[in-house]
């Protein structure tokens, strides 16, 4: 096993809990690590990529920077039209770069999900919406952390899909995916995912938003907001926080299944299921429907292989 994947298993196994070895072994085989990389992308009138920038490039492993460059050059979008005419268009970009073990001697990294939203990440904050053209939080109460999961040092991320009506209330909410940073058998993992998902949905139902009153979205009857909720545990008596990797650092976890949501299915199929590409920056994320990727997400940079080595620090 490579040093990189060995480190992932150590990170997920401590503090240790006792589970049936067969179930844990199955979970180990599905372990992956990823990091979220944000930036901006510009698309030519013909749909090719004009250029891009990455936030805090100096914090990213060189292998990740190179992979993204090779991947994006092969992308092709549906031309973005303004008043019926294709034009150069910019969007906020968020990419999920995933590292997986191929065999005992090789690891591979690839871009596995992407999200494109407002032109800049700050466009959904109240201060940037003085003209009330954006959706913004009025109330976002955090969820309650299930006590038994805290005691078992279970951390993870829940990816929610939230439908907001014209009154700024949550009309529908569903869990799209739950990734866990603990090893256990399948039954236990399912239970933990269910508990974190229920806690997240319960909190989301109490949220309130200010809805767009001006601009292109003012006439919409509802908005779909993608929200990641991170659950992390601080180890008593230490500064260690389980489940809070920094920007440019690898986040090890057992990925959960992507749930197909009936009222969201059209968007999920069109975007190849990009739930885990949503950044948790405290602002409502609304995908920009104008940016439709026509080529495979991995482009020409998919699956870069690293023989017996770590694909980069972080």
Predicted regions and their residues:
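Charge-biased low-complexity segments
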Residues: 19-314
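Bacterial N-terminal signal peptides that target proteins for export
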Residues: 1-8
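N-terminal signal peptide c-region/cleavage motif recognized by signal peptidases
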Residues: 13-15
């Amino acid at each position: 096993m490579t040093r990189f994947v060995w480190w992932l298993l150590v990170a997920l196994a401590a503090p240790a809990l006792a589970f049936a070895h067969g179930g844990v072994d199955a979970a180990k085989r599905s372990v992956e690590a990823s990091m979220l990389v944000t930036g901006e992308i510009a698309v030519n009138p013909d749909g090719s990529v004009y250029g891009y920038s990455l936030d805090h490039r100096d914090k990213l492993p060189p292998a990740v920077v190179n992979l993204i460059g090779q991947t994006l050059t092969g992308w092709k979008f549906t031309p973005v039209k303004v008043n019926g005419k294709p034009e150069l268009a910019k969007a906020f970009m968020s990419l999920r770069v995933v590292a997986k073990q191929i065999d005992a001697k090789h690891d591979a990294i690839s871009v596995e999900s992407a999200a494109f939203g407002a032109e800049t990440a700050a466009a959904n904050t109240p201060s940037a919406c003085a003209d009330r053209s954006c959706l913004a939080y009025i109330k976002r109460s955090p969820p309650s952390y299930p006590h038994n999961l805290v005691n078992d040092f279970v951390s993870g991320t829940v990816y929610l899909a939230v439908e907001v009506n014209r009154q700024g209330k949550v009309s529908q909410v569903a869990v799209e995916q739950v990734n866990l940073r603990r090893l256990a058998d399948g039954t236990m993992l399912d239970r933990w995912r269910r508990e974190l998902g229920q806690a997240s949905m319960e909190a989301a139902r109490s949220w309130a938003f200010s809805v767009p009153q001006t601009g292109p979205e003012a006439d919409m009857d509802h908005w779909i907001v993608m929200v990641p909720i991170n659950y992390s545990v601080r180890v008593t008596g230490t500064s260690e926080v389980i489940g809070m990797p920094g920007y440019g650092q690898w986040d090890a976890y057992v990925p959960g299944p992507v749930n197909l949501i009936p009222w969201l299915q059209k968007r999920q199929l069109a975007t190849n299921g990009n739930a885990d590409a949503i950044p948790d920056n405290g602002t409502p994320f609304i995908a920009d429907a104008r940016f439709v990727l026509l080529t495979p997400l991995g482009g020409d940079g998919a699956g870069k292989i690293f023989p017996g080595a770590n694909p980069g620090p972080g």
